[in-house]
Amino acid sequence: MIRSVVRGIGSALPKRVMKNTDFEGIVETSDEWIVQRTGIRERHIAGEGETTVSLGAAAARAAIENAGLQPSDIDLVLLATSTPNNTFPASAVAIQRELGITRGFAFDLQAVCSGFIYAITTADLYIRGGMARRVLVIGAETFSHILDWTDRTTCVLFGDGAGAIVLEAAEGHGLTSDRGILAANLRSDGNHKEKLYVDGGPSTTQTVGHLRMEGREVFKHAVGMITDVIEASFEATGLTAEDIDWFVPHQANKRIIDASAKKLHIAEEKVVITVDRHGNTSAASVPLALATAVADGRIKKGDLVLLEAMGGGFTWGAVLVRW
């Protein structure tokens, strides 16, 4: 059987780092308040000339180089983002152009913070269906452009950045010891769309709008939804939490991460946490955390890695991948 194997990984962050203390002159908050409630200490904020496309392209180049490939080897560019450069064409097409790719196809996928999980799952289906051999999967965001910088409950939470992986078709044996994606489960429930959304859009207000969130409601649903979809992935493979080498969750809030790991009985030392230095980068969150753990030597070839994320909609999902 065909498996989608991770061939390369890369990331990119804006130059500007904004620490918690930098918010004290903008809104009523403090470093202690932010750290205690979120675990965030700093985040990167896009500056002049740094866009979703430029960050996504930089992460993509790094992933392709890490894979030992050329841009011309890529069949599909799949970008997960909620902050595209333009309403259309897709920012994935712009990244395709930046990379000099003139073959294959490219499109955007929008599932907010779950975007990268949705994108990996979609890429896996294209690979296993024979429509693509190598897929560049990117999560890139510039949420700083849709924040209400007078709302202290949201503006302190988010950062900008991009992460990317190259998935490649490889022959597997149908075993959980195979390298590549072993299971993926996606969910959504539109009944919760008012709990996390942006209050603008082309067909309604003709504006970009700002992010709005009912933080307590999101927290209340997050742990249960995340653990349920992970359990479905375990059930599909016969694997358990004890088999996991690394848990790479969406980096939204350390309290949600800790509660999810505890409910799943995953040891703290197996949890990859970068929310302290990146904040919530939405669709870029999981690949940025992955890239960090690969770069520092934690995630190695053959490791079983559990990915998960939850975002506005609500949307949520989980992926089990053998590195």
From Swiss-Prot:
Any Pfam family the entry gives: ACP_syn_III
Coiled coil: none
Active-site annotation: 113, 250, 280
Subcellular location: Cytoplasm
Listed EC numbers: 2.3.1.180
Leading EC class: transferase
Single GO term (MF): beta-ketoacyl-acyl-carrier-protein synthase III activity
Major localization class: cytoplasm
InterPro entries: ACP_syn_III_C, ACP_syn_III_N, FabH, Thiolase-like
Reaction equation(s) it catalyzes: malonyl-[ACP] + acetyl-CoA + H(+) = 3-oxobutanoyl-[ACP] + CO2 + CoA
Disulfide pairings: none
One of the protein's GO biological processes: fatty acid biosynthetic process
Alphabetically ordered keywords of this record: Acyltransferase, Cytoplasm, Fatty acid biosynthesis, Fatty acid metabolism, Lipid biosynthesis, Lipid metabolism, Multifunctional enzyme, Transferase
GO cellular component term, pick one: cytoplasm
Pathway of action: Lipid metabolism; fatty acid biosynthesis
Keyword GTP-binding (UniProt): no
Domain of life of the native organism: Bacteria
Region of interest called ACP-binding, as start-end residue ranges on this chain: 251-255
Subunit organization: Homodimer.
Family, similarity comment: Belongs to the thiolase-like superfamily. FabH family.
NCBIfam families: fabH, PRK09352.1
Swiss-Prot/TrEMBL domain comment: The last Arg residue of the ACP-binding site is essential for the weak association between ACP/AcpP and FabH.
Protein name, UniProt field: Beta-ketoacyl-[acyl-carrier-protein] synthase III
Annotated organism of origin: Brucella canis (strain ATCC 23365 / NCTC 10854 / RM-666)
Lineage, uppermost ranks: Bacteria, Pseudomonadati, Pseudomonadota, Alphaproteobacteria, Hyphomicrobiales
